[in-house]
Amino acid sequence: PNDLVARGRKLGGILVEAARDNEGKPFAVCGIGVNVNYTPQEVPDGGLAAIGLSDLNESVPAVDMLLDEVYHAVIDAVDAWAKRLNAKEEDAGPLAPVHDEYIAHLNWIGKHVIARSPAGGELTRGVFKTVDAFGRACIETEDGLRSFHFEEASLRPLSE
């Protein structure tokens, strides 16, 4: 779940790529995009309609000020999460220490969704129940619970 959603529309997105340096130490590269002044365009098939900050608030901060605020908020949150993750039990999933907080911010929990493959094909439909402590989206289908890693599926709400 990497979309930033407001009022059921896509405000932006987050992409995180894990890698290792020359000494084998892990690190992550994080990119965040936010629609500031959005001009409506065609919605991609299976995608969400977009929205901009200017649609949500009359006074939108200057881009450099927004960048500074987002940067510091992300750094503070990552530092706090890192402390909790480093203190977790060894056999717990990587999201265990932040799971409840993470779930509280997810869209479509308890809603009917469609899971699509990276190529856009339909994988399943059902009710989005949760994301487990290992980061898998859990969807209750007619055939039972199915779980998908983030790279396997993208979830979109179904019109009811």
Model-assigned labels for residue ranges:
Residues 6-160:
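Long, positively charged amphipathic alpha-helical accessory segments at protein N-termini or as interdomain linkers
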